[in-house]
Amino acid sequence: MNQPKSPITVLIVDDSPFMRLTLQKILSQDPEIKVLDTARDGKEGIEKLQALRPQVVTMDIEMPQIDGLQALGEIMRWQPTPIIILSALTTEGAQASVKALEAGAFDVVAKPSGGPGADIQALARDLIDKVKAAAQVNLGRLGKKGAVSRISSASGSRPPWTAGAASENTNRLSSPGSTSSTLGSAKGRSLDSGEALPKYPVEIVAIGTSTGGPSALQAVLTQLPGNLPVPVLVAQHMPPGFTAPLAQRLNGMSPLTIREGVHGEALKAGTIYFAPAGKQMQVQSRGSQLILHIGDESPITTLYHPSVDVMFMSLAKEVGKGTLGVVMTGMGNDGLRGMREIKERGGYAIAEAEETCVVYGMPRAIVDAGLANRVAPLGEIARHIVECVQRR
């Protein structure tokens, strides 16, 4: 006879009595979750965490004495625990949440913006799903960004890619200005002879990720060379208002331009475009250019805005075999349908290896479906992207 599964234990840390009560009611609705206690600030939260040892913590950012960011740092240093940040939909809240994710927070949930009704119901669905996912997290990956070596654009060795060759790949892109004649070569381990590279020139790179994504994106995007001859699109599951601060923060760490995409703009090589949270990002051909189409409409029914599937499907249609799709850490299987279409049209797929994923959900769907051309740990993904782009 099977023993009943023990409920997931949770500690709630929030300075608002209303939010503590609301979160407790929400989580207590699910028989698989048990709220052990609540705390009024970061200091009390740390003390109760040490005493109760919950599996998951929900934590507000702005609190007296010790705020959420300080408490997160202490917890990750001494007792790593999956922490779900609850953040207000404000510029300050979004910026603090991005810092929390980089410091090792599991995920972010947006607090209700005003009217209880629908907002509370949406919060309940999101929070319960993320608490259950957090309980399965690879604790060893929280806050880690992967062992990556910088891919230098000033390497002494000349890679097989040249500016002349790249022009055949990027004839639909707006010029980003003058670039060096060689793409930064990939340092470190070279590919095994048995590992296949794309059959067709890569015109565009698209990356999809969810839980654990901000840290993973930092590990990958900041290691790409400044003369990358193709554009990069990113769909990261986040609450509305949170992708702009993330892109802005990463932009300061990268030799490439990283920002939110703008509806109607032409894609440029050497620029990384984030899909705005709450919207869908697709591409459309206009003459010799690829144009971003950003809006509310979605060609498929999906819970995610932005959706990796929507982005991938658009690229499969407009770019086809010139698409390099990358799926990294995240819950669920968003990206599976779109990646299948990319592969059907001759494109190439990279999936993050289980060993480095915070949550091995989205990449696992790609691997289990037999779609991945290459499965790589986080620290090697940037190198593989460069090797695929410079493939002739």
Swiss-Prot record:
MF terms in GO: phosphorelay response regulator activity; protein-glutamate methylesterase activity; protein-glutamine glutaminase activity
4-aspartylphosphate modification, residue list: D60
Cell compartment(s), UniProt: Cytoplasm
Chief place of localization: cytoplasm
Listed Low complexity bias regions: 173-185
Gene Ontology BP annotations: chemotaxis
Keywords on record: Chemotaxis, Cytoplasm, Hydrolase, Phosphoprotein
PTM field: Phosphorylated by CheA. Phosphorylation of the N-terminal regulatory domain activates the methylesterase activity.
InterPro entries: CheB-like (IPR008248), CheB_C (IPR035909), CheY-like_superfamily (IPR011006), Sig_transdc_resp-reg_Me-estase (IPR000673), Sig_transdc_resp-reg_receiver (IPR001789)
Location of the region described as Disordered in the Swiss-Prot/TrEMBL record: 148-194
Enzyme class at the top of the EC tree: hydrolase
Reactions it catalyzes: [protein]-L-glutamate 5-O-methyl ester + H2O = L-glutamyl-[protein] + methanol + H(+); L-glutaminyl-[protein] + H2O = L-glutamyl-[protein] + NH4(+)
Documented EC number(s): 3.1.1.61, 3.5.1.44
Ranges where the Response regulatory domain occurs: 9-126
Gene3D superfamilies referenced in this protein's UniProt entry, alphabetically: 3.40.50.2300, Methylesterase CheB, C-terminal domain
Gene Ontology cellular-component terms listed: cytoplasm
UniProt cross-references to SMART domains, sorted A to Z: REC
Ranges of residues in domain CheB-type methylesterase: 198-392
UniProt-listed PROSITE patterns: CHEB, RESPONSE_REGULATORY
Database matches in Pfam families: CheB_methylest, Response_reg
Active site, UniProt feature: S210, H237, D334
Function, as annotated: Involved in chemotaxis. Part of a chemotaxis signal transduction system that modulates chemotaxis in response to various stimuli. Catalyzes the demethylation of specific methylglutamate residues introduced into the chemoreceptors (methyl-accepting chemotaxis proteins or MCP) by CheR. Also mediates the irreversible deamidation of specific glutamine residues to glutamic acid.
Notes concerning its domains: Contains a C-terminal catalytic domain, and an N-terminal region which modulates catalytic activity.
PANTHER family: PROTEIN-GLUTAMATE METHYLESTERASE/PROTEIN-GLUTAMINE GLUTAMINASE (PTHR42872), PROTEIN-GLUTAMATE METHYLESTERASE_PROTEIN-GLUTAMINE GLUTAMINASE (PTHR42872:SF6)
Protein name as catalogued: Protein-glutamate methylesterase/protein-glutamine glutaminase
